[in-house]
Amino acid sequence: SKKNEKKLQKGVDDPQRPCQVRCAYGNIPNKMRTKALILTAFVGALGIAGASAQVYSVNAVGYVNKSIPAGFSIVANPLNNGGNKISDVFGANPGSLTVYRFGDAGFSINSYDTDFEEWDDGDATVAPGEGFFVLNSGDVAVNITFVGEVPQGDLSNGLPQGFSIRSSQVPQEGKLDVNLGFPTDEAVTVYQFGAAGYSISAYDSDFEEWDTADGAGPVVGVAEGFWVLRASATNWTRLFSTSE
């Protein structure tokens, strides 16, 4: 068919900009200030209180704007969007994007066809905590708006032995272990890759420090994924609430 012929012609060579979090209160700076981060959605009979009052709900809904540069970068879905189907996560007409996923189920490639306005597999899921490569085949950056609920409660993200691509389950920028709770129970290496190139950060479990310039470890952005290399499996756990 015409569609299949077109897709066969899509050749891909083998191989962050800062996210902008917005809410009802305007732009939010680098560190997540949870009381101002969320465009709060109140569930059930909760009403909106006066501007001076502080009100919290069980579910907090927000959106994250991310610029995906031309070429390859490692991206993540920062919010729960229903079933986290790729067609919902990236929204309508995201541009000439191809998503490369590497996980327990193996390797998969999923492309968006701008002519037919559909993904190869629009039902494929990309949940918070997972990282994946994105190839933007266009000449300019593509702006994606992620919409959904902020993950809360007891969060757990499996880190297997060997290589995996992961991200923070919470839409927060910060030092990987100090701010985001990444486990440093053993020697671990983190690989980051974006428009500006790549960086490698290694944690020395004997000296209990990273090899970064300040010794405090890599900084990870909102909706940024990264490679992790571990000698043994563990879980990246975190107890999080937007009311903190």
Predicted regions and their residues:
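N-terminal exported-region signature
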Residues: 50-244
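Extreme N-terminal basic, low-complexity initiation segments
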Residues: 2-6
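Detector for intrinsically disordered, low-structure N-terminal pre-sequences
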Residues: 10-11, 20-23, 42, 88, ...
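Sec-dependent signal peptide recognition
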Residues: 34-40
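Bacterial N-terminal signal peptides
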Residues: 40-47
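Short, positively charged and aromatic/hydrophobic N-terminal segments
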Residues: 8-9, 13-16, 20-22, 26-27, ...
